[in-house]
């Protein structure tokens, strides 16, 4: 595991040893080796989800963290491929700074997933905010990026203060924050609603829960493509991963507060789906769609059942890949048309038929068409919530209907007869087709061998 981390950091000096014209080729090629090195150096067992393989006192992995680490490593070369067109005209020093920030961000995310101590998790959890803020502030295209960065930092830091206070209280009373030990602690003396809210506050904001979601659309719209892909594929998953870890600790179970949270999450999923129907900005639409999906994930985790956590975990992987691909497609359209306004993108897919096919594939996975892993995750989530309470079914059904409506309308708006004002667009490059294929490849692999993630909690 640590070999993978050191290899990831070593990409920077290795890339510098190549000539300027091979800079991005060397970085992308070496980044592609990282997921495979992780498999080689990390012995995995698909039948021991809660057996943590400890590397030292601070870091370890199990079948909950390992897939998310692999997803983090897999996304690094995809972010580089997506950013190449945007960054190639910048000075070499800026390009080096950019990939250094990407590697630092991925390293912090991986170490967060591998943390076996809650205080260590908290420090890395908050540290991962710094690289994404740098990307938004330095490489954002519009002056609104300052406002987006302020929203992101304000929401995240305000939510982190109760989490820090709760961890200090637990450390003082239990004398440990070691996750494997806390998973065995079942004393009822720590069952406190205030402690529960403190522990989950920062995670619910990072997910984000409806009501604390205002930072996400702003951050997505103003971030570069690598920032949007990181937010969609990995940053939002930090909240879900943390909630799963804490929900596996018996002394943090609170059925009454879970009931309130499930109600808010399902209501938020419906409301953000309605908001998607009225969006005019393509990236904002995809961002609100992420809030809706994360609402379902949060509700599933709060059922406190292994079946619900399994569905939430599958959705984390599936949504990470599909939403990242959607943001890449939106950015590619923006690079060719210089607009994200949906009404101005009408008929553009008639000029790019192969691109239209990619849109269809990614949208179908995002709205959970079988046999995609998104479909498996939503069926599992619906089953767990229906078993928890049949009253949740109307909210689930309404969310799925609205999701299908705005997803297909987003696709159909780009079809139709060409306007006389439509300019000729350059076709997708091999780089763009490769990036989209590499988003779909893990989904196809999991569909072929679903036990990789389905049986983790079973």
UniProtKB/Swiss-Prot annotation:
Pfam families, per the entry: Oxidored_q5_N (PF01059), Proton_antipo_M (PF00361)
Enzyme class: translocase
Keyword list, A-Z: Electron transport, Membrane, Mitochondrion, NAD, Respiratory chain, Translocase, Transmembrane, Transmembrane helix, Transport, Ubiquinone
GO cellular component, one term: mitochondrial membrane
Gene Ontology BP term (one): ATP synthesis coupled electron transport
InterPro entries the record matches: NADH4_N, NADH_UbQ_OxRdtase, ND/Mrp_TM
Superkingdom of origin: Eukaryota
Membrane topology field: Multi-pass membrane protein
Residue stretches spanning the membrane: 22-42, 63-83, 96-116, 117-137, 150-170, 194-214, 224-244, 257-277, 284-306, 311-333, 350-370, 391-413, 434-454
Compartment(s) of residence: Mitochondrion membrane
Catalytic activity of the protein: a ubiquinone + NADH + 5 H(+)(in) = a ubiquinol + NAD(+) + 4 H(+)(out)
Gene Ontology MF terms: NADH dehydrogenase (ubiquinone) activity; ubiquinone binding
Record-listed E.C. numbers: 7.1.1.2
Biological role: Core subunit of the mitochondrial membrane respiratory chain NADH dehydrogenase (Complex I) that is believed to belong to the minimal assembly required for catalysis. Complex I functions in the transfer of electrons from NADH to the respiratory chain. The immediate electron acceptor for the enzyme is believed to be ubiquinone.
Similarity-based family: Belongs to the complex I subunit 4 family.
The protein's name in its UniProt record: NADH-ubiquinone oxidoreductase chain 4
Lineage: Eukaryota, Metazoa, Chordata, Craniata, Vertebrata
